[in-house]
Amino acid sequence: GFAQQVTAPEPEFINSYCVLTSDSTFDALPKEDGMISKHQNKFGKFAKIAGAVGDLGFAGGMIGVSTAGSASGAINGLRVMGTAAGVGQAADAVNTLAGAEGMDIAFAGGKSAYTVKNASNGIRLLIKGEKNEYDPMEIYRIVRFKASKKDRRIQWMEFKPALIGSAETKKRGYVAFTGHKYGNQSYLLEIPASEAEPGEYGIFYMSIITATAIPVGTFSINK
């Protein structure tokens, strides 16, 4: 399979996002923290959620989740992501960002500090986790941001892994990829060449099992 030709060592640190530059070498990607903000297009059904999120002080807050205590808090159907309560169940890991549904997650600056040199054969990402027993399609999302001079944004949406690669999720900026375990505690994710269009990208890690914040690895693909 595709993982067998790769001989690169596992990254040194947990939650390191790396891009393979050959079968045996990689570069570490920069990590950035996003801010939750109101979606910049028309709201429609998300207006109520946005209002509730604003009232709870989510808007403009860092995306993060408390590991103190395992209380699950739901206010107006939103999961609490602030310091008051964390979502304690591993099974709920993918719901960390549920409170951000329909909101934009924005990153300062119009461009990542890292540009992929050659994306013509697709992009291979190597990510070290706590362990690699989860399906990477459930715990990672790769997005193509809407980029302006001032920031990069993605409207957050929740969907099952089976929808990765569907027309609807791709239209919203969610990139199709495949994932496999690699080594003792890493994952190898592959973005096919057909998806590796010029633009600004981010890799979201959605599990909250040990995370107190959600680091997002970013990269650019030039024309």
Language-model-detected regions and their locations in the chain:
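Short, solvent-exposed loop/turn positions at domain surfaces
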Residues: 113, 189-190
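A generic structural signal for beta-strand entry/edge sites
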Residues: 122, 184-188
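Extended, solvent-exposed segments with strong compositional bias
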Residues: 158-184
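A glycine-anchored, Pro-Gly-centered beta-turn/N-cap motif
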Residues: 185, 192-204
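Primarily secretory-pathway and cell-envelope proteins
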Residues: 4-168, 205-223
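Solvent-exposed loop and beta-edge segments used for protein-protein assembly and interaction
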Residues: 117-119, 181-183, 195-197
